[in-house]
Design a protein with these regions (language model features):
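Intrinsically disordered, low-complexity, mixed-charge
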Residues: 1-90
């Protein structure tokens, strides 16, 4: 299992990035969470097989249709609880 903490910047709020992330992650069977941050970024944690986490990280680099991703910062982290949730904004 692999777990990664992600911070995505660019035009990623107000474009359904959180909802898209939740759907993509759940569809891949990943555990973790996603939330908007007050600085305009989106933060997430993904945990699952190396293959599925890598595919999710690649997908995050483009995001949903209306998003414009500028940068993604990915760092290893501790595994989250089971399931995938959309957390309230920070």
């Amino acid at each position: 299992m692999k777990s990664v903490h992600v911070v995505i910047s660019g035009r990623v709020q107000g474009v359904w990035y959180r909802a898209w992330t939740e759907g993509e992650a759940a569809g891949r069977g990943l555990n973790g969470w996603v939330r908007n941050r007050s600085d305009g970024t989106v933060e997430a944690v993904f945990s699952g097989t190396e293959t599925e986490v890598a595919a999710m990280l690649d997908a995050c680099k483009t995001g949903p249709r209306l998003a414009s991703v500028k940068e993604g910062v990915f760092e290893p982290c501790d595994p989250p609880p089971q399931g995938f949730t959309k957390r309230p904004s920070e």
